[in-house]
Swiss-Prot record:
This is 2-oxoisovalerate dehydrogenase subunit alpha. Its EC number is 1.2.4.4. The keyword Metal-binding applies. Transmembrane segments: none annotated.
């Protein structure tokens, strides 16, 4: 647990970094996280990567119809999950946040059930894959239209302020969202109202095929916070500790009633934008190889190893545990069975009107 709030500089030219490329500690304050916490961060990152790999298998075997790979985002997403109060604070995620969902505690049965559209999906198979939600964990159901969840996040945060709940709304998005009108409207509204919100850009430098330099003339996304009169933090999002400490500072700042912040976590997606994308058409292999050398998982592994918190035997034990959890979650999701067609009539009206009852009866006759 963080014993005190560490003040980080806003609007820096270079990303805030606490772990060097070789795993060395770069912070100007003593590390105050215990070994078990550090190991948990690593395990969650590993689980996020392995879940991502399992999603790829699902699409290639025809068990799902869409994926949005997130390899390279693990440090950022796991850090966010650990920096908030799961089930108390609210999360307004975007479609690449399955690592965040898993680290927050959404069961694998539900995540995989959502990918397969089985009865294990709390959304009853109504969303396209990669669009989970969790009422129990205050995890807002993912919306496809880019940045459309930013105004609802602002509105939720304002309600938290008015009701004095002590909660914080955390809203994540990709770099492409920052070119949408909803993004500006939502953050401006939250800033004007002093809402307890943290807006986090997982900047992987590509909005599908549009690279960052064609997305905006702003040097950084964090710089855009100037327009709203709120703090803007530029962070190395492939550094799990820098991401954790900065996001936690922004969250606690919001919780104290000091208003919203904008955090830019610079990451890189190793895979395509989605299963509908061929990333070799717009980015060179050399670029991907360059970023592969900055992989957040080996980087944090070196950090742990230097502190006697990692060895190959422990790594294999953890991987085996995660494999077993993935197999069990997939088995439970598949055994739940497909969503029945008649479910389409549920949750449409509080009380089914006559015409809906009629349609339901006609469907049952056909079935």
């Amino acid at each position: 647990m963080v014993k005190e709030t560490h003040r980080f500089e806003t609007f820096t030219e270079e990303p805030i970094r606490l772990i060097g490329e070789e795993g060395e500690w770069l912070g100007d304050f003593p590390l105050d996280l215990e070994g078990e916490k550090l190991r948990r961060l690593y395990r969650d990152m590993l689980a996020a990567r392995m879940l991502d790999e399992r999603y790829t298998i699902l699409i290639r075997t025809g068990k799902t119809s869409f994926i949005a790979p997130a390899a390279g985002h693990e440090a950022a997403q796991v850090a966010i999950a650990h920096a908030i109060r799961p089930g108390f604070d609210w999360v307004f995620p975007y479609y690449r946040d399955h690592g965040l969902a898993l680290a927050l505690g959404i069961p694998l049965k539900e995540l995989l059930g959502q990918m397969l559209a089985t009865k294990a999906d709390p959304n009853k198979g109504r969303q396209m894959p990669e669009h989970p939600g969790s009422k129990a964990l205050n995890f807002f159901t993912v919306a496809s239209p880019i940045a459309s969840h930013v105004p609802p996040a602002a509105g939720a945060a304002i309600s938290m302020k008015l009701l004095r709940t002590g909660q914080v709304a955390v809203c994540t998005f990709g770099d492409g969202a920052t070119s949408e009108g909803d993004w500006y409207a939502g953050i401006n509204f939250a800033a004007v109202q002093g809402a307890p919100a943290v807006f986090i850009a997982e900047n992987n430098f590509y909005a599908i095929s549009v690279d960052y330099r064609h997305q905006t003339h702003s040097p950084t996304i964090a710089d855009k916070a100037h327009a709203f009169g709120i703090p803007g933090y530029l962070v190395d999002g492939m550094d799990v500790l820098a991401s954790y400490y900065v996001v936690k500072e922004a969250v606690e700042r919001a919780r104290r009633g000091e208003g919203p912040s904008l955090v830019e976590l610079r990451v890189y997606r190793y895979g395509p934008h989605s299963s509908a994308d061929d990333d070799s058409r717009y980015r060179p292999k050399e670029e991907v190889a360059f970023w592969r050398k900055k992989d957040p998982i080996p980087r944090f592994r070196r950090f742990l190893e230097a502190r006697g918190l990692w060895n190959e035997e422990w790594e294999e034990d953890v991987r085996e545990e995660i494999r077993a959890e993935l197999e069990r979650g997939l088995k439970e999701a598949e055994e739940a069975g497909p969503v029945p067609p008649e479910w389409m009539f549920e949750d449409v009206f509080a009380e089914k009107p006559w015409h809906l009852l009629r349609q339901e009866a006609l469907l049952k006759e056909e079935l």
